[in-house]
Amino acid sequence: MPICLKGDERRVKLLFVNACPRGEDSRTLRLARTFLNALTALLPQCEVTEEALYPAGLTPVDAALLARKEALCDRRAWDDPLFAPAVRLQAADLVVIAAPYWDLSFPSALKLWVEHCYVRSLTFHYEGSRCVGMCRGSQAVYLTTAGSPIGENDWGAGYMQAVLKALGVARFTALSAQGLDLAENDAGALLGEAMARAAALAEEIAGNEKARPI
């Protein structure tokens, strides 16, 4: 339901990309909900749209789908359902991605989402040989949890930062809870500490959004 705003409050569109296969049992999703609850409490004009990737069942981009996509791009047929994820990304002021740390990166559904969001003349265009992003977002937040330490193998966050930067979202913050499955660690305490950092990050971002000119 649209939020009714008072006075000169600026509506903030937030896209929440939920790439958590375990649903509400996911520790990553719990971390994300903590962040989103804190942010929307501080920024009541924030409108959250959730892109739940597992019920979405995005189709892998094969040769036939790629040909259809290119033809639709040529016609700028942005109302075609194929472009719905890209349209939502392009319009978002804030992008929040929740994805568990799997196999040195993230679940495959998130890569499918990226493939559906790279849309010529909608989320990016070319100036000569240079790719220029067209998304309006000012900030992206990437939230993840890992059973083991991630260390230098943070390929998922690094990849998503590069993708979003290419599409025009320059500011990127990654936040994680790591080592949750190690016997010597207190998983609850580690997750709780990450949730506290998530709430603090939400406060920082809410302050930045309130300071932006209307």
PLM features: what roles do these ranges have?
Residues 126-169:
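Short, glycine-/small-residue-rich phosphate/pyrophosphate-handling segment
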Residues 2-99, 104-119, 196-214:
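N-terminal beta1-alpha1-beta2 submodule of the flavodoxin-like/Rossmannoid cofactor-binding fold
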Residues 13, 47, 138-139, 171:
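Residues at the starts of beta-strands that form the adenosine-phosphate
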Residues 19, 145, 177:
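Cofactor-binding loop segments of dinucleotide-utilizing enzymes, especially the Rossmann-like FAD-
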Residues 157-214:
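Glycine-rich phosphate/pyrophosphate-binding loop and the adjoining helix
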Residues 120-124:
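Short catalytic/binding micro-motifs of nucleotide second-messenger systems
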Residues 21-23, 147-150, 181:
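Short histidine/acidic/glycine/proline-rich micro-motifs that form metal-
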